[in-house]
Amino acid sequence: MKVLCLGGAGKICREAAYDLVEFSNFKTITIGDYNESAGREVVEWLNDPRVDFKRVDVNNKEETVKLMQEHDIVMDGTTLSLNDQSTACMAEAGCHGINLNGFGDEYKYDREFKNRGKTHVPGFGMTPGTTDMMVKYAADQMETVEIVRVSHGAFRPIAFSASITETTTYEYDPNLPGRVVYEDGKFIQVEPFARPREIRLPRPYGTHSQYIIPHAETKTAAQYLSHKGVRLIEVRGTWPPKNMQLIKALYDWGFMRNDKVKVGNVEVGIMDAIGRYLMQAPEGQTTDLYGYALHVEVIGTKGGKKIQHILTHTHPASDGSVKGWEKLRAYTRCVGIPMAIGTQMIASGKIKMKGVIIPEFAF
């Protein structure tokens, strides 16, 4: 079996590739990336004879499809703005797929994947991904489900990669239609910083105000739990306090609209400029506490009694006391490992459903 790690030079996808090297039976693990120097650096870091590098530009569909056709599955770590193109390439190439974001562009390719007898699972990192499994674990123990609240703390620098910078701008876009809650059978659009709720995360992360965010779990959980009468689904998140302070100020002052401004003879989106600055500034590349913590609450009934499940997640300390989990790797490994596990499960034939499948049905 051969796997193509698309965007494999990225900080998160390389961790998924590392997990495949450590635990999978793939005969070939190809790092596919536009950035050749970073990609070859990952190959050297992984130091395994099964690993090679192929340069690929997802915007070049013909080239990308040809490369994908040489592989059984694509583990897609590209940015959310590229997921439409990358999924289209997988569908045409006739290979299995999985990605991190799951924001919705992938589902329009369902028929193509079904026709080719292939499976694609969008949104399988930490959030969405592991959170979907936590909701499913709790809900499957209940006869009816009334409330689902998914919350997370992503403790990472605000702009350590292009993908993360893009995600930050996307999630707090004031006009984003996908920032919704599910309430009494309807998806209701809400503004940034809507419905604040204090969430107590596992140590060392503590209690933080969290706000509604545009994540796939709202829609996938609604689909999975439709037969159990679910009335409310809310997905919240937070970043380090300094990050949230900055995003709130940018939102209050209108920067998050990303209006075009003229600088000299050049016109640029103001958030695009701020994002580029943060990617080059030390303040955008570091944070005080690293890692990822999840908190999932599911309320329902069993045997005629009302019950509540609260599930949490954490990981080895990021302070250097545990090798391989130092600082940023405590965050990136948390996101990469679930995608690697999902990749192995799909490639090994454990997922019988074909088409583009939500995580709750796939796993």
Language-model regions: role of each:
Residues 5-19:
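N-terminal Rossmann NAD(P)H-binding glycine-rich loop of SDR-like oxidoreductase domains
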Residues 10, 35-37:
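Helix N-cap at the beta1-alpha1 junction of Rossmann-like dinucleotide-binding domains, i.e.
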Residues 46-60:
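Rossmann-fold cofactor-recognition segment
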Residues 57-70:
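Conserved Rossmann-fold cofactor-binding substructure of NAD(P)-dependent oxidoreductases
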Residues 68, 72-77, 97-99:
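N-terminal Rossmann-like NAD(P) cofactor-binding module of classical short-chain dehydrogenase/reductase
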Residues 89-107:
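ADP-ribose/adenylate-binding Rossmann-like module
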Residues 101-120:
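Rossmann-fold NAD(P)-binding glycine/threonine-rich loop
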